[in-house]
Swiss-Prot record:
Name by which UniProt lists this protein: Probable inorganic carbon transporter subunit DabA
Molecular function GO terms recorded: zinc ion binding
Entry similarity comment: Belongs to the inorganic carbon transporter (TC 9.A.2) DabA family.
Gene name as annotated: dabA
Source organism of this protein record: Rhodospirillum centenum (strain ATCC 51521 / SW)
Membrane association type: Peripheral membrane protein
């Protein structure tokens, strides 16, 4: 039986396609494993406040956006959330979304809130009717096809991608008898009779399902959420295409595929589902509206965040334990702003008052597309919000380097051929018997987590094409000004990118540098060092007022965040005159590594000593080689002296910034529109993986299987998982990451900050809708002003009596 909406206006194809596009933009993109980066799972809801987003995603995915009420109640009982924190959060909430009194709020905090399920799909209604798991069957068949279609080199028999996704699926589905065996009669023929293009299929299915115009976007969003990571990998394709001014229809194609299943199921069950389905259509058509329960959850979340902000305010108000020595630094070292660098920076600075560290985005301002030694793959080593502007490669164009490059390519191809031989359909059976014994040594080494021989470093990177002097000078000047490093240079300045060393970890790239697009940061660091050591560039910088002493040398380095070991690329710029400086720096780095490992061992399970850390990096059974950015809570853009000597516990992104040197506030604008946004993606990915792990988390590492080279599934098929594995946010007994929205602290005039927000509505939306908190620091580094939205600020000062940061006045 076919159904159509009675009394509903005729829906044009354009109306349906526009609704499909809006639904596509409501889901987050998912980057492939080779270059995975943190993504804000709520990117499509940035225009909503937390209560409204909670209402929307409850309908679309059946999830909550905050922790269970018991989590907040326990913190209220322990005093971690003070009375003042709760009162302040209550006062800041809209009147229509809060209880009438604070007492009523407290009572609600100790009661479990209701969590209604997502609005039903036809597949779910059909399952409830005859107990056949149609949602599971749909996910299994779509996942089986999608893992081949989206494959990026893992499959031995790859699916051709010359066709659009819908057309490719249609070719497969017309020969797949699994749905009919499960009980969906005539499905293959129904697909064969469907329109050949996705847009026409959308229109056909909408008509058959009887959908109203008001229900389209909400229903489409619901269907895309049922696809898990498959919809998100298609959204990634659209994201990448739009960076180059193009488009991609993969999300619309997947929506057409999912709708085809819905229409086929409705055709099968017909009148038996009509009452339930008509009620569902009406529910989809209703506007999204936050409830009082959503408001209570948001207030409790705000109170937990204000408690953390109160503790941060107290910490920044303390007198630092040590001050930097006056005069020329003995060593300067620039790190990525990554929270893991905070631990190492603090350890390094504690060794000598002459050591100065800086924080800057780990791609060091160089938006490059890099081709590694012996590879043709161009790696985008820059934030995913940007496009590469410069293309680089490894090694000088000399006969010796060219020969080594060819040798590396031949070796890589031989390894790939050997790997395919091991996995081929026939040879794999004989391979184990014939070649198994030669793997005994490797098996023992990996099983016992013994040290491996170090791989040789790539030759020093260089621009693939000659860059003009003006271009090189502009790049150098912009980076130094953005780092607030225009004077007071040490004899030795180290520029440290960061990466991680782990084994048997599909999500290894997620441990690398997010600002480098999921790659390690040594290439950018080495390129910048070469640029700043260039004599012509230095002469040009001097003409712009940036005078680098003749005895200053810059060297690239790599901070391994898993082992806290640092590699210095001294051979890139050999200097006999700096041999003593380099040897002393290496001793300091070794000592700092010991201190940092000791501190991090306290947080890691089964790591009683700092010596246990390197072993974990080599252990192929280790689920938690490091905590990555778990625990991140704050972003601070201020001079280093505001945070130096204070134990931020590896929870803060630290970006050096001195607004007094920033004429026109161009650097501040860059910070707010790039590093802050990247940090928000990281923070909100951790947040989503904790509060909604079933939808925005990657599940259990123990069950992971890599599929298509793009992502992981749990078991042998089904939905592609996105977000972070549970072991990345939980230590087995308790959470390793508190789900708190990021607090952004900036030392700069409020008028300058507000002006930038006014010019960048996308960034302003994140703060206005409280996906991020914003504070302006005063000239002493204290949290003096809180941003309340609509370009308004509240003065906040420490109130020891109430234990809160109270409101004083509006500005």
């Amino acid at each position: 039986m076919l159904m159509t909406a009675t009394g509903s206006p005729f829906l044009t194809a354009e109306t349906i396609i526009v609704a499909a596009d809006r639904a596509a933009r409501a889901i987050p993109p998912l980057w492939p494993l080779a270059s995975s980066v943190a993504v804000n799972p709520f990117i499509g809801q940035a225009g909503d406040t937390l209560p409204t987003a909670a209402a929307r995603l409850r309908r679309a995915a059946g999830i909550a956006l905050t922790m269970p009420r018991s989590w907040y109640a326990e913190r209220l009982r322990s005093g971690e959330i003070a009375e003042g924190d709760l009162q302040a959060a209550f006062d800041a909430a809209p009147a229509e979304l809060r209880p009438k009194t604070l007492a009523a709020l407290k009572q609600a905090a100790h009661a479990q809130g209701t969590r209604p399920p997502a609005l039903p799909t036809v597949a779910e209604l059909a399952r409830d009717l005859d107990s056949i798991d149609w949602p599971g069957i749909v996910n299994d068949r779509i996942g089986h096809w999608a893992s081949g279609y989206f494959d990026q080199g893992q499959a031995l028999w790859a699916t051709a991608q010359a066709q659009r996704a819908y057309a490719a699926w249609r070719t497969v589905a017309t020969h797949d008898l699994t749905p009919e065996i499960a009980g969906l009669a005539g499905f293959a023929q129904n697909v064969a009779d469907a329109p050949a293009d996705a847009e026409a299929a959308l229109v056909r299915c909408v008509t058959r399902l009887g959908l109203s115009g008001a229900a389209l976007e909400s229903y489409f969003h619901r269907l895309l959420m049922t696809l898990g990571g498959w919809g998100q990998i298609a959204r990634y394709r659209l994201w990448q295409a739009e960076l180059t001014g193009n488009t991609d229809a993969s999300v619309v194609d997947l929506l057409a595929i999912r709708l085809t299943w819905e229409a086929a199921l409705l055709r099968q069950y017909g009148a038996a589902l009509e009452p339930q389905w008509q009620a569902a259509i009406a529910a989809y058509a209703r506007p999204v509206a936050a409830t009082l329960e959503d408001g209570v959850d948001a207030i409790l979340q705000e109170a937990a965040e204000r408690a953390a902000q109160r503790r941060l305010h107290s910490l920044l108000s303390e007198t630092p334990s040590a001050l930097a020595a006056p005069g020329r630094p003995a060593l300067q070292m620039a790190f990525c702003i990554d929270v893991r660098s905070e631990v190492f920076r603090r350890a390094l600075e504690s060794l000598d008052p002459g050591i100065r560290t800086l924080g800057f985005a780990g791609f060091f301002g160089l938006g490059i597309g890099h081709r590694r030694f012996g590879s043709d793959v161009v790696e985008a080593r820059l934030p995913v919000l940007l496009r590469p502007g410069v293309f680089t490669c490894s090694g000088e164009a000399t006969p010796a380097i060219d020969k080594a490059d060819l040798t590396a390519r031949i070796t890589a191809r031989a390894k790939r051929a050997w790997g395919r031989f091991k996995l081929a359909a026939i040879s794999s059976f004989a391979f184990v018997e014939a070649a198994g014994p030669i793997y005994v040594g490797r098996l023992l080494r990996d099983g016992l987590a013994l040290p491996r021989p170090s791989a040789p470093n790539d030759p020093a990177p260089r621009p693939a094409d000659d860059l003009g002097f003006d271009t090189r000078l502009g790049m150098a000047a912009n980076v130094l000004r953005a780092m607030s490093l225009t004077e007071g240079f040490a004899r030795l300045v180290l520029l440290a990118g960061h990466g991680a060393s782990v084994v048997n970890n599909p999500h290894a790239s997620a441990l690398h540098c997010g600002a480098c697009g999921g790659y390690s940061g040594e290439v950018n660091a080495r390129l910048l060092a070469a640029l700043l050591n260039d004599r012509d560039v230095r002469a040009g910088l001097a003409s712009q007022g940036i005078r680098i002493p003749d005895d200053t040398v810059f060297l690239g380095a790599l901070h391994d965040t898993t082992t806290d070991e640092v590699t210095v690329y001294a051979a890139d710029h050999p200097s006999v005159a700096h041999a003593g400086d380099l040897e002393r720096a290496r001793r300091w780095l070794t000592s700092a590594g010991v201190l940092a490992r000791g501190e991090r061992a306290l947080r890691l399970p089964r790591a009683a000593r700092s010596q246990d850390i390197p072993h974990r990096a080599r252990d192929w059974a280790e689920l938690r080689p490091e905590w990555a950015l778990a625990g991140c809570q704050a972003f601070v853009a201020a001079p280093r002296e505001r945070t130096a000597g204070r134990d931020l516990e590896g929870r803060a992104f630290l970006h050096d910034y001195d607004w007094r040197r920033d004429k026109g506030f161009g650097v501040l604008e860059l910070i707010l529109t790039a590093p802050v946004v990247v940090a928000s993606w990281i923070s909100l990915q951790y947040y989503g993986s904790v509060v909604a792990p079933d939808v925005f988390g990657a599940g259990n590492k123990l069950l992971h299987n890599v599929t298509g080279g793009i992502g992981v599934v749990e078991g042998n098929g089904g939905l592609l998982r996105s977000g972070l594995p549970w072991q990345s946010v939980h230590d087995g007994e308790q959470l390793a990451h508190e789900p708190l929205r990021l607090s952004v602290l900036i030392e700069a005039p409020r008028e300058a900050i507000a002006g930038i927000l006014e010019r960048h509505p996308g960034v302003r939306t994140l703060f206005d809708n409280r996906w991020l908190h914003l504070f302006a620091l005063d000239d002493e580094g204290h949290m003096a002003w809180r941003y309340t939205g609509d370009l308004r600020w509240e003065n906040c000062s420490r109130d020891a009596a109430s234990g809160r940061i109270p409101l004083r006045e509006l500005a």
